[in-house]
Amino acid sequence: MFQADAYGGYRALYESGRITEAACMAHARRKIHDVHARAPTDVTTEALQRISELYAIEVAVRGCSAEQRLAARKARPAPLMQSLYDWIQTQMKTLARHSDTAKAFAYLLQ
């Protein structure tokens, strides 16, 4: 497993299937946050709220045993990520393709 941003040069690492990509949510969140800081909207507010739910998992497991952290990380993020993904897909249909929000969302979807 390799955690990195969406730098295109890393794609070759994942092609063989020997290395699994673990995307960096911090980079995706930052892109949305930067758009929100310049021009907050209900859409960017909700996106940041949904991402904060993922971060809350880490806060909740801080101080827990390694086994408890692993169990929480396996169980809790997947439905939140699927919901975020589905919601962003829906939002993308309503956004101008070249808008800053659409670009930030496209980065997250990579």
UniProtKB/Swiss-Prot annotation:
Pfam families, per database record: DDE_Tnp_IS66
Top-rank taxon: Bacteria
Keywords in alphabetical order: Plasmid
UniProt-recorded name of the protein: Uncharacterized protein YuaH
Native organism: Escherichia coli (strain K12)
